[in-house]
Amino acid sequence: MKSLIVALAIVLAVAFMTLAERKLMGSIQRRLGPNHVGFLGLLQPFADGIKLILKETVLPLEANHWLFVLAPFLSFYLALLNWLVIPLAKGVVLMDMDLSILLILAISSLGVYAIIYTGWSANSKYTLLGSLRSTAQMVSYEIAMSLLVLTVVYMGATLNLTELAYLNSGTVLLWSLWPMAMIGFVAALAETNRAPFDLPEAESELVAGFMTEHSAISFTFLFLGEYANIITISTVLNLMFLGFYNPLVIYLFIWIRATLPRLRFDQLLRLGWQYLLPFLIGFLMIQPSTLFVLDLF
């Protein structure tokens, strides 16, 4: 029952995040955004959801129908699975595990398979290229994210996300890891395929990327999975570096989408492999030694 309540809460959070995104982007672009459905457009996400659910699901003739239907659901299911170990409030968590951070990393790695299946099962060149782009991007930045988490875990001496959040209430760990928080946010943008790293969904090149052939309920699950991942990774970054919940990270996701242009694919991979990865390896070696010598931690 608790898991069902959390799942419904995440769906509602996704609904209102899309509304906030459209409102904020409208404000940045000097327009109103949704303002007709309900008071100030507050019912717009529900109208969009009902519209998508009532539409007909079109199955491409040459598609692998089983994978085509199941892959979007797998994407959303994996996004929800993380919330088993993420603390919902102080002392409130569905499953308090000592290895909760490790479980989150494992689940995020499995998300690559859902995207591969989504793109391959449609038997379309656009969906396949979009899924391959997304896979290469996620694998590249998954390494950076893993090293980032390793550094934080090394400093906090725990793999329990709840304990790490309490530990971050102190200022020493927080300020010493401030550069890592910036890199973590960049890696989070790439992990969730958000601007300026939204190459898997580049409309001018790949129509809608790996979601091109999906419609109705299958598109709804892909959409829910994408935005649920944004909420999940924003929450994890908050707990790892700030020690509390702050909507600022989600606001930055939206603000950057409205302001920054899309990178080229070679620029994206170069940033991950030639800049972020060496910096993280160097930081992993230097930071603990520096704090030990200065007797700060």
Swiss-Prot record:
Its EC number is 7.1.1.2. The keyword DNA-binding does not apply. GO terms for biological process: aerobic respiration. The chain crosses the membrane at residues 1-21, 34-54, 66-86, 99-119, 139-159, 170-190, 206-228, 235-257, 277-297. The keyword Transmembrane applies. One of its GO terms (cellular component) is mitochondrial inner membrane. It catalyses: a ubiquinone + NADH + 5 H(+)(in) = a ubiquinol + NAD(+) + 4 H(+)(out). It is found in: Mitochondrion inner membrane. It holds the Pfam family NADHdh. GO terms for molecular function: NADH dehydrogenase (ubiquinone) activity. Keywords: Electron transport, Membrane, Mitochondrion, Mitochondrion inner membrane, NAD, Respiratory chain, Translocase, Transmembrane, Transmembrane helix, Transport, Ubiquinone. It is a multi-pass membrane protein. It comes from the Eukaryota. PANTHER family: NADH DEHYDROGENASE SUBUNIT 1, NADH-UBIQUINONE OXIDOREDUCTASE CHAIN 1. Belongs to the complex I subunit 1 family. Core subunit of the mitochondrial membrane respiratory chain NADH dehydrogenase (Complex I) that is believed to belong to the minimal assembly required for catalysis. Complex I functions in the transfer of electrons from NADH to the respiratory chain. The immediate electron acceptor for the enzyme is believed to be ubiquinone. This is NADH-ubiquinone oxidoreductase chain 1. The gene is nd1.
